[in-house]
Amino acid sequence: IETLNSCMIGLPGETVGTIRETLSFLRHSKEVKQANLAIAVPYPGTELHSMATQGKHGLKLLSEDFSKYWRYGSAVMNVGELTPQVLLQLQNDAFVSIYSAPWRWLPMIKRQGIMGFILMLIRVIKSFKRIMSNKNGLFRFKENK
């Protein structure tokens, strides 16, 4: 039986520290063969959207543009001190950190084939380049208290 994992960051009350704990778990869990990490999206009509538009629980909606409401590569609200840019950087850092572990490669090739693996490797390399050009680097965010 293969273990897959999906989790979400950018929920009310989260900090860089709590997100780091989640990412560390995913990064070091050899039982988890695939880990998906989405950024919370406050879709209209949801409780999360209501909280974000009303500024409750440290949330602040920054865009009503529905074309920007994606779970990957986009964020449309502040979560406490976490800006969309920080959430995106954490998501990219996590992807590189999780999928650059060589012990994940063979299961990925078996599951997605060599082309799927190559596409993942390209994304990791692009994300890694982006991380290295960012002065914060991999998981070096200062937590605001």
What is each PLM-predicted segment?
Residues 1-112, 142:
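A structural motif corresponding to the C-terminal lobe/cap of the Radical SAM core domain
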Residues 97-145:
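Membrane-proximal basic amphipathic "stem/tether" segments
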